[in-house]
Structures are given as C-alpha cells and as structure tokens.
Amino acid sequence: MESIERYSSLPSGAPRNFIQGSYDQLSSTSRVLHPEEIVEPLGFHYRNDMIMDFLPGVDLFTGQQIMVPAALALFRYSPKAPAVNPFAFHHTNGLASGNVEEEAICHSLCEVIERDAMSLAELRASAIPFHFLKHIMNSLKAKGYPISAISADTFKDDPGIFPDVDISEIEFEPAKDMANKFSNAGIPLIIKDITSTVGIPTFNASSIEWVTHDYGYLAEGHGTHPDSRIALLRAITEVSQTRAANIQGARDDLRKINYGQDNTDDKRAWQFMPSKNTIKFSEVRTYFNEDILEDIKLLLDHLKGDGLATAIIVNLTNPEIGIPVVRAVVPGLETFKITKSVMGHRAKRYFKIE
C-alpha cells in the first residue's frame, strides 16, 4: 500500500488538472490555502502575486472546495515556469491509502496528528530545553562570566516530560504478542505516551540493541489512532520495521548511535531513556468505534476542540490502479520532527523565556 501511495502522489502518478495562478488571482473567486497558513519552511520570500500550481481539495469541516498548492499535495513536485514552489521541503506527511476512501482519510488524519505530537515531544524534551540552556549561557557570557561551551551532542534531554507506559498487563493479543517477541529476544522496548493536546492516543516506541560494546541498533516508532490499542500496535510494528531496515542497511536516513563512551543515545536522548513517571496502559484514554466514519468524526471533533478549524483532503487516487490515496493538510499542526526548521503557534506555547 505504501508503494501505491508514493506512486499515486507523484506528479506523474495520475492525471493532474492543475489550476495555475497567483494567490491574489484565485482568492478573488475561490477559497485558497495560503502558504503561510501551514507550518512549513519556505525556500524564499513568498509574495501573493507569484504564480503557482494548485489542486482542488475539500475542507472536511465545511464540505467546501479549497485550492491547495500542488507542492503540498504531491510528492517530489517540481513546477514548470512560470509557476514556482516556495516550499523548502517535500515529504509524505499526511499521505495515506486505504481499501476505501474513508479508510485512507482516517489514516491520513491520524498521521498528521501523530507528526504534530512527535514534533511537540521533540521540541519540549530536547530542542527547546537546549535552546533555553544556550540562551542562559549566552546571557552569562555577555555579563563576563567564564562559561564553557556545551555542544548538542553532549546535551542530555529531559526524559521525565512524557511517562513510560507499562504494557505488561495489556489484554490486546496482537500488541501483547509483538511486545513478547522483544522480551523473548532480550531487546528492551520503551513505550512513552506522547499524546498531544489534540487528545488522540499517540505513542513513541523505542529500542536499543547492543551487538558489541560499541555497536548497536537504535530504532524508534510511533503510532496514533482513536483506539489506543491500535495506536500502540502501530508504534511497536513501526519500531520493528525500523529495526529491520537498520539491520539491513537499506536506508540512509536512519538514526545513528554516538559511540563515544557514556555519550550514547540511551543515556541522553529522551526517547530511549526511562522516564521518572510510569502509567499503566489502561490509564490512557481510548475511543472505540465500529464505523470508520465515526473515527473520522472523532478526529475532526478533537482537531476543532484544539483550535484547528480546517482539515483538507486532496484526492490523489490513480484511476487505473483504483486504490484510494489522499493527502491530509491541517493548517496549524506542527512539522518540526520532519523539517527541523520551523515552529508554529502550538509549539511556541512552550517556548517562553521569562
């Protein structure tokens, strides 16, 4: 399914009826998503009179059509002049497929909520505390105090912000079986509850397996779903997938272990360090629905309840393949985990220096 997602999301993956024009031109007659409404880094200074390619999407809150910059909907999109692409990155966040369109929509919404939670967790436990420390150091230096520099590769994250989740008593057999495989292999598995203020269960799963005294496999996975059991299973299966890819060496974007003595990620990265707080899996809020439409409604209600008023779906289905593929775009959700470069209003709530 993932290969179908990727192919269908390419500019050449299906017939594309681009609507070309500037924001100023199109917004006079249509609803248009402005590039600055979303949390994405721009590659250059954007102006509203710049020509771009757009694709039609649907706002799930209103049912109305909204024009979306093609660069946000498609993967590896490069415009032809005179159109421009102001965005600095391309990625697959919010891209999902399903047996039916409703399933694809549910998966896509869960993914953007998951990436938002991941971004906020990374910022709160690592990036923002490091910035605070650097700010304090620079202030002391400016006052003439002799302060030694601290580098990012020696900074220790805060592992106590997000609780570890005890899954020893879980009764959901698929997740229980997966966790037992780690236990039987002697590989530690750490589960953290990183659910954001959106309120949809989200977990971070991690493992470190030392092969020798200075070589090991480090893996991380995430999962989000209204049903906390499914969210947990997704996180564990993703960390398993990452481990397999790491062992195989088939990707070039996997996280590397710093092999310096006493400076490995299991001693300084929040995802891999035990938390001071532990909760039972049964304490995590969960939602059970028999109809996937009810799951979608729940996701939308939670987004709206957290101040996110627009949720756009762009249909990217290739008619020859016939497998529903969509891209979800929710203005306001964070993407720092992907881009490592920008923060939106949700992240900035935690970024205050008195």
PLM region spans:
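Helix-biased "structured C-terminal domain" signature
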Residues: 1-354
